[in-house]
């Protein structure tokens, strides 16, 4: 019978919940002095925080070349009309959403088509430049 039990356990593993951890309170005698935090310890902790902030600033300075290339390509002559149509559509949809009967309209315009045209143009412009920079 143990063979079948072992076979079943190997196919269908059983997980057991962990036993609850008992909270053990450490009692301190009433006449024992409490630990005092020295000024040196506080100053050291502040210095560590400043070092962490400097590291974060260094990381933020390195910009993603893809984002900068996308912005540049959006402003090119080839992609400018697509960007213009996309922003016009956004304005039109936003204005339409402010109308009182917008919720009851049968057709609600979105700017997905304009967005995809813009992204297609930007991606065609970015791809060769990005791979040259990454080499």
Curated annotation (Swiss-Prot):
Question: Acidic residues: which segments have biased composition?
Answer: 19-64
Q: What is its main location?
A: mitochondrion
**Where are the residues of the annotated region Disordered?**
1-70
Name of the protein in question: Cytochrome b-c1 complex subunit 6, mitochondrial
Q: Where in the cell is it found?
A: Mitochondrion inner membrane
State the protein's purpose: Component of the ubiquinol-cytochrome c oxidoreductase, a multisubunit transmembrane complex that is part of the mitochondrial electron transport chain which drives oxidative phosphorylation. The complex plays an important role in the uptake of multiple carbon sources present in different host niches.
Provide the topology term for how it sits in the membrane: Peripheral membrane protein
Species of provenance: Candida albicans (strain SC5314 / ATCC MYA-2876)
In the record, biological process GO terms are: mitochondrial electron transport, ubiquinol to cytochrome c
Q: What happens when the gene is disrupted?
A: Leads to decreased vegetative growth on several carbon sources.
- Provide the alphabetized UniProt keywords: Electron transport, Membrane, Mitochondrion, Mitochondrion inner membrane, Respiratory chain, Transport
Concerning its family, UniProt says: Belongs to the UQCRH/QCR6 family.
What do the Gene Ontology cellular component annotations say? mitochondrial inner membrane; respiratory chain complex III
Chain ranges passing through the membrane: none
Q: Which Pfam families match?
A: UCR_hinge
Listed under subunit, the entry gives: Component of the ubiquinol-cytochrome c oxidoreductase (cytochrome b-c1 complex, complex III, CIII), a multisubunit enzyme composed of 10 subunits. The complex is composed of 3 respiratory subunits cytochrome b (COB), cytochrome c1 (CYT1) and Rieske protein (RIP1), 2 core protein subunits COR1 and QCR2, and 5 low-molecular weight protein subunits QCR6, QCR7, QCR8, QCR9 and QCR10.
């Amino acid at each position: 019978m143990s063979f079948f039990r072992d076979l079943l356990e190997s196919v269908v593993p059983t997980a057991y919940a962990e036993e609850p951890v008992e909270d053990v309170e450490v009692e301190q005698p009433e006449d024992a002095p409490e630990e005092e935090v020295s000024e040196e310890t506080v100053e050291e902790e502040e210095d560590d925080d400043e070092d962490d902030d400097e590291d974060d600033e260094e990381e933020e300075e390195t910009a993603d070349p893809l984002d900068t290339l996308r912005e540049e390509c959006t402003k090119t002559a080839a992609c400018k009309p697509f960007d213009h149509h996309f922003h016009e559509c956004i304005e039109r949809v936003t204005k339409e959403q402010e109308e009182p009967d917008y919720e009851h309209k049968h057709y609600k315009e979105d700017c997905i088509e304009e967005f995809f045209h813009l992204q297609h143009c930007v991606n065609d412009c970015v791809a060769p430049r990005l791979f040259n920079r990454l080499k």
